[in-house]
Amino acid sequence: MQKFSLERALSLESKYDDSLQTRPIGDWLSKFVLWFSVLFALYHYVTAGIGVPVDFWHMGAHMSGVIVLIFISFPAFKKLKAGGEAVDVMGRLSGVPFYDWLFIVVGVMASLYVGVTWYGLDLNFLGFSFSIPEQVLRMGVPLPIDVVFGTLLIIVLLEAVRRTIGIIVPIIILLFTGYAVLGPYIPIQILKHPGLSWSLFVNNMYFPDLGIYGVTLWIVSTVVFHFVLFGVLAQRIGLGQFFVDLATVADADEGQATGTRLLGLAEHIPSGLDAHI
């Protein structure tokens, strides 16, 4: 049986797993991604031990980190995944187009907006004042700025999902979104319903405990992430192969002991029976 080495595993992954076909980036950005990933992982493991921050900050930080890594690593189109060295050309920074940097900035701002404005926000700048009431007063009646940031986050997440796992899931999401918002205009009577306004839809999708910042993201950021990361690290350092080898050795020892016991038993079989055997 062919030994399942790390090199063979990486080769199979790069061949069949489309989500691992990332784009080439520059040296300084590669170092940034490395250290950002290390700090991102340490944040999750440290907070798992000493206690996570309040949900709207923790999930916002988790979402921000994921958005940064996705839009740096995954190009918009598959044809951009071809190998080659990353160069700084017009419209690109260390191999990453400026529209992807825009996605990162918008996604991080929209992810952290809920935490920043949770207890309200009062801004005074150059004689202009801007006030946002605390989040509990905006539930069900979101402000226009809430709708803007919520819409931006939905767009960014749809694009992130498309880049990482394909177009099918975003299409399904858009179909159900259209069904929720365009209910009164559906021609099939049995499917028609009053529908939701876009602001109410964004309210349900954007604010915690309801949509994007609901139970699923909380479980992923507090439990699932840690197990997935441990599995990846175990594979990369050869821990998986260690357990395979350990099982093989244990099976070999057990097989040898079984063979010895069978030979010992055969010595005590009567000669007549032995002849028949």
Regions from the PLM with identified roles:
Residues 1-141, 147-151:
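Conserved, well-structured core domains of diverse proteins
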Residues 10-13, 17-23, 90-93, 132, ...:
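Generic alpha-helix detector with strongest preference for long hydrophobic helices that associate
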Residues 41-50, 70-81, 107-126, 141-146, ...:
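Structural signal for alpha-helical transmembrane segments and their membrane-water exit/capping regions
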Residues 148-152, 170, 221:
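Hydrophobic alpha-helical transmembrane segments
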Residues 154, 182-276:
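Membrane-embedded alpha-helical segments and adjacent helix-loop junctions characteristic
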